[in-house]
């Protein structure tokens, strides 16, 4: 993690203009490129985009030149374009709510789009209020007054004090992820106390809690709930442990193995554009563990290209 506060260029929206800290890492971005509709489900980061972000990012934080880069990722933003804008940079990041009955004469259909994660609760409120209005329900959305689950009992420091059986750094990490729910985790056995993900300090008890209570069905769900696989090793050491717990909970080890392969392929997809130095060594070690030690996936008969993970 390079910085503890947001570093932002005060200028009109452009490439590589913000460095944001989050959990144990920081994220630099963004670039903006128009892509064909048929490619939206398979976004790829290019080497040129990575070079551009790092070169410009060093102007915000010179230490980026010596900082280990874990991964790069790309996604599609559902923004509404203005007529005549070809760059995409002048597209509003604001929220757009369409009532298709008024707009297109289609009853029973609305669209909420635009915005970003920071505004999702406002988007939910706007959409809910419109739906209630159209269904003649005299009630307003309550999300602005309702704390998110786990967030209603003070700050992270206070919550962490209730997790007595963990090191202080791990207490803060767990409390930061699940808030006051952390006090409900069990640490009665050595297994419950053991770490599934050492990079992010995620204990087995937190993983089991997520599987049982947080609608976790696969490793991607678990990653989003607990940050398993998002640390330095990118799932190298923790993904198998987590897959084992999922297989045990769901009673299907074969599905857990398939889930593990898919999860590691997605981790590789993010590592490939930044595969140099320590990240390259980590990727090679991961490949060796999964292919040679665990026998998960074999190389193709015609050889494996750098763009294809050897454990696929």
Predicted features, each with a name:
Residues 1-29, 33-234, 246-247:
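C-terminal catalytic lobe of FAD-dependent flavoproteins
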Residues 62, 235, 239-265:
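Long, charge-rich, low-complexity alpha-helical segments
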Residues 162-164, 236-241, 273-284:
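Charged/polar, low-hydrophobicity segments characteristic of intrinsically disordered regions
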Residues 251-312:
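Low-complexity, small/polar and acidic-rich linker and loop segments
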């Amino acid at each position: 993690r390079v910085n503890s506060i947001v570093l932002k260029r005060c200028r009109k929206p452009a490439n590589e203009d913000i460095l944001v800290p989050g959990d144990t890492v920081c994220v630099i971005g963004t670039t903006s490129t128009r892509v064909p509709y048929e490619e939206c489900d398979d976004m790829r980061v290019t080497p040129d985009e990575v070079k551009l972000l790092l070169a410009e990012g060093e102007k915000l934080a010179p230490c980026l030149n010596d900082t280990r880069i874990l991964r790069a990722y790309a996604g599609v933003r559902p923004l509404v374009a203005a007529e005549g804008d070809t760059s995409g940079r002048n597209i509003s990041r604001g929220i757009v709510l369409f009532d298709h009955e008024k707009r297109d004469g289609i009853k029973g259909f609305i669209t909420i789009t635009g915005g970003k994660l920071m505004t999702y609760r406002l988007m939910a409120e706007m959409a809910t209020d419109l739906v209630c209005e159209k269904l003649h329900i005299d009630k307003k959305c309550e999300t602005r007054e309702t704390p998110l689950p786990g967030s209603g009992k003070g700050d992270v420091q206070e919550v962490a004090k209730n997790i007595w059986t963990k090191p202080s750094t791990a207490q803060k990490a767990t409390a930061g992820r699940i808030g006051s729910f952390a006090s409900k985790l069990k640490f009665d056995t050595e297994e419950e106390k053991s770490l599934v993900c050492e990079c992010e300090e995620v204990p087995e008890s937190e993983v089991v809690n997520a599987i049982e209570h947080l609608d976790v069905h696969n490793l991607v769900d678990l990653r989003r709930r607990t940050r398993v696989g998002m640390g330095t090793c990118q799932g190298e050491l923790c993904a198998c442990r987590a897959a084992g717990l999922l297989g045990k909970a769901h009673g299907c080890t074969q599905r857990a193995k398939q889930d593990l392969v898919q999860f590691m392929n997605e981790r590789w997809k993010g590592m490939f554009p930044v595969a140099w130095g320590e990240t390259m060594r980590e990727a090679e070690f991961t490949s060796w563990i999964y292919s040679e030690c665990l026998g998960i996936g074999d190389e193709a008969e015609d050889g494996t290209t750098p763009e294809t993970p050897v454990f696929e």
